[in-house]
Amino acid sequence: MSVDNRRSTRKAVTGDPAPREIRRRPKNRRAQIAATSAAAFGSLGYHGVSMEDIATALGISSAALYRHYPSKYALFQEELLRVGSAMTEAVRLPADLADAPPRARLEHVLEALISTTIENRPTVTLVRWEGRYLAPDDLALLNGQQMTVLRALGTQVAALRPELAETDVRVLCVAILSAVTSIADHHAALPVKTIQRLLTSAATAIAAVELPPAVAAELPAPVEIPDSFKHELLLRKAVELFHARGYPNVSVEEIATAAGLSAASAVYRFYRGKSDLLAAAFRRAADRVSGAVGPAVAASTDSADALETLIRQYVAGSFAERALTFVYYTEFQHVPAEERTVLRNIQRLSVEEWARLVRDVRPELSSAETRFLVHAAFAQVVDLGRAFDTDPAGSPERVCLLMRAILFGS
């Protein structure tokens, strides 16, 4: 028995009181709270997290947490605007680089933006997908910060490529920001320096893309769903509402009304509830992506050809179902847990198949690196879509080119 053990035993026998543990408040408590809340919000969504959840994760009481922040919203708002501000500072060009060559200036801005994104990866998730739950004035501030980032990128891209029209510069900058912040859409891991190198290379390839003329795409008209196909009509209307207002802000009653049903109870003849509708939508999106891989590979002459086919199919499918594409990125945390496991496996396998093709084309990259690039390519569709909607500047043909630049390299 050790000396320490003997002392402990004596105290137990004699009844000597144990020394009181003094817990001191860490000097960086607010930073700890910010990091913990960002991880929680990023994983479960703003509506899926309570102050009690955050306090428990920190090992403190709710009362202690409320001494730092008066509400969950205050915590959420401060963290999003903090990172938005950090991103705007990152793209500010130092005075000593004002006369540097255009490429050097762009590389500096990219390096700083990528570093800031990596450092704040969990909160960047919130900036990308949960910012819509900010109050209008706060959302305007966040959007203003993001526009500042895009303008700063635009200044450097325009200097590098003065022949580009202003709209085309904006397209390339949206694509660059999308590729950089796409690391917030997944949990794949790589060393920081590797991520920096990979994203810098992808962003540089995007900046060099020769965009075709902006021509409106002839998208197929939405298929009319007969009233007798209520299960399909419910699914479409639910996705449209989730896209417009966010899953937590949509009720079963509203879905029923949109689908022309007389009462919410009628929905339950087709689906067990709102979460079942969301899960069905996610399965459809996941199956569309995973089901395309095998036929594309079988019909192609090589991996590059298969990748070209998959890019075209992915973009066409996403443009045909814009609302579903957005919902797939924003509402995953609201899918029932058992469905999330299945969907994660489907998505992981789909990404692995794409990544394998990319590695065939670019054997100098590791499997982990190609997975990062696949996620960056996927992000182009949703980010160009929400930035330009039906504007020809963000046409399917252009999105395909941007995806190719990321996956095939410059």
Protein language model regions, located:
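Actinobacteria-biased recognition of intrinsically disordered, low-complexity terminal regions
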Residues: 1-28, 214-215, 225-228, 408-410
